[in-house]
Every structure is written in C-alpha cells, then in structure tokens.
Amino acid sequence: MQTRAALPHVRVAGCLAAGGLVALLAGCSSASRPEVEKVAAAFENPSVAPQARCDLLAPKTLESLELSSPCTDALPQLPFQGGDVRSVQVWGGGAQAKVGSDTVFLTETDGGWKVTAALCQPRGEAPYDCQVEGP
C-alpha cells in the first residue's frame, strides 16, 4: 500500500522535473533568438560585404558553395533580397529564421551561429528547396 501512495508523488516529481527541463530549454532558445536573428539578417542582406557574409557560413556549407567559385564571387550572383526577420525558431543546436520571403537554417557552433542553408523555399511535405546549402 505504501508503494501505491508513493507512486503519485514520484509521477508528480517526474512531471515537475520534465517541466523544468522544458522551461530550461525554452529559456536557452529564447536567449539565442537575438543572435540567430542578427546572423540571418546579415547573411540575407545583399548590402553586407560578401566576405562578412561568407564568414557567417557553416564550414560544410561554405565548402559546398565554393565548389563552383569563391564564396565572395558566388554570393553577389545569388538573388538575396534581404528584408525584415519575420520569425525565429530555435531548437537544441539548430534554428530557422524567416527573412523577407526566404528561410534560413542555422547551426550553433563554438564560434556562434552559422548558416547551413539559405534562400530556402518550402515545398509542402518535401524538404525545403535551398539555393545555398551544405551536404
């Protein structure tokens, strides 16, 4: 009988612990939002210097982009329109920002947030179609 009486307390404690974890993760994601917004807006802004924008790319994305030409030559050729950041979602070490009519995906690195994909358009249930992306 004591076991049954103790179980509700265990469940409540477990729920409180899980709730605390969710609150902790939500706090981390909201703290990251301004940085994600700043990086996404700068990368999508065609008036920002190409080298500064290239520095915002994740290493594998930079490598993929430079298969055809140097990043500083490639970025000005792409149809970036810039615009206001309309929304930001952060989860774990990843983020998504909607800038103007585009979607930007980012990853958190030791050096801060880096762009993994940009100039992305949704395709319903299929993965986004991105003009800039890593492997």
Where are these regions (language model features)?
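Bacterial signal peptide processing site
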Residues: 29-31
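Short beta-strand edge/turn micro-motifs at domain boundaries
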Residues: 103-134
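Sec-dependent bacterial lipoprotein signal peptides
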Residues: 1-26
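Short solvent-exposed beta->alpha transition segments
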Residues: 34-41, 45-89
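Short, intrinsically disordered, charge-biased short linear motifs at domain edges
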Residues: 13-15, 40-42, 55-61, 107-108, ...
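Exposed beta-strand-loop-beta-strand "reactive/processing" segments of non-cytosolic proteins
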Residues: 80-106
